[in-house]
């Protein structure tokens, strides 16, 4: 088993808002949405390339690319399937490129040229560059705290030459390492974990995430490749079958707010996504949900809850496979401090993901933080158990 310590940073959305001042400006303009509403031009297949909102991604770990390894911080993202990092050849006008580590193929003895161009479409522009092949080490430099790393040979990844807009400039991470199914991989590139399985580098084809919800705690969490660790959860794991092998998609029976409201009535589909920090659902249903927890709209789909009311709010229960996964108001109300004031943001956000991929609910870090999550590629299922409070 390989353990990768995860570090928690303030999300870009919060960092930007701190730069912008006032709570009203909390929400960055025009979020870069991974679940883009349009159908991208590139993909002729049946799957729209739903793209993602990294404004809130908060958990990162380190990987190495090349020989000797060049280190990068990446978001280990179960809601996408490609690996990309900034390239040394990025455009001068690409400011995001100035603020991050860049891959230099000249410095790697294991680099193999590919050169195919790639585009990943986002709500606010597209990320583009070309593909290259090299060795990927996870973690970058195995240390005493995370011994035993793994080296994946011949991994194809994207060297980003152009990154859109202001979003990536403020990002604390250099790139993204996608851990979803190959089916949603841009250019049909084999994802890192698939390559790892083919090269038989782990005993079991599973990986699991522990995300520490205590913002001050270090490490911020742990990604484990090839197994699970019972010190991170209580009780036993319950497994839920993947219903469509693209995202880590499972069936959700319903979602209840106390005893006053049920949404996703009659069942719906949900994806478990480590690269999204909130719980996201269809706009109309989330609007009702926010009303039921007394949240008031901010802007761009986010809502605020008066902090003094948090302790008296109802539990929210996600029902999966007949089992109740409860979230207390402390789990779903996020405290954000700014200068002298602390505001509480609702951990739910509305966004409509169009067919054929959608409609979908997204169970992001708010959910995964409370429930230790195991992603099982051998049996195509997601395991959940209550996370231990370390």
Swiss-Prot record:
Active-site residues, Swiss-Prot/TrEMBL: 77, 273
Ranges of residues in domain Peptidase A1: 59-385
Q: What is this protein called?
A: Cathepsin D
Q: Kindly list the cysteine pairs connected by disulfide bridges.
A: 71-140, 90-97, 264-268, 307-344
PANTHER family from the UniProt entry: BETA-SITE APP-CLEAVING ENZYME, ISOFORM A-RELATED, CATHEPSIN D
Q: What does the record note on quaternary structure?
A: Consists of a light chain and a heavy chain. Interacts with ADAM30; this leads to activation of CTSD. Interacts with GRN; stabilizes CTSD; increases its proteolytic activity.
Q: What EC number is given for this enzyme?
A: 3.4.23.5
Per the record, what is one GO cellular component? melanosome
Task: Give the GO biological process terms.
Answer: proteolysis
Q: List the carbohydrate attachment sites.
A: 114, 241
The gene name reads: CTSD
Give the catalysed reaction(s), semicolon-separated: Specificity similar to, but narrower than, that of pepsin A. Does not cleave the 4-Gln-|-His-5 bond in B chain of insulin
Describe the family membership recorded for this protein in Swiss-Prot or TrEMBL.
Belongs to the peptidase A1 family.
| Task performed by this protein | Acid protease active in intracellular protein breakdown. Plays a role in APP processing following cleavage and activation by ADAM30 which leads to APP degradation.
Q: How this protein is processed and modified after translation, per its record?
A: N- and O-glycosylated.
Which cellular compartments is it found in? Answer: Lysosome; Melanosome; Secreted, Extracellular space
Per its UniProt record, what InterPro entries does this chain match?
A: Aspartic_peptidase_A1, Aspartic_peptidase_AS, Aspartic_peptidase_N, Cathepsin_D, PEPTIDASE_A1, Peptidase_aspartic_dom_sf
Instruction: Note the pro-peptide positions.
Output: 1-44
Record GO terms (molecular function): aspartic-type endopeptidase activity
Q: Which UniProt keywords apply?
A: Aspartyl protease, Disulfide bond, Glycoprotein, Hydrolase, Lysosome, Protease, Secreted, Zymogen
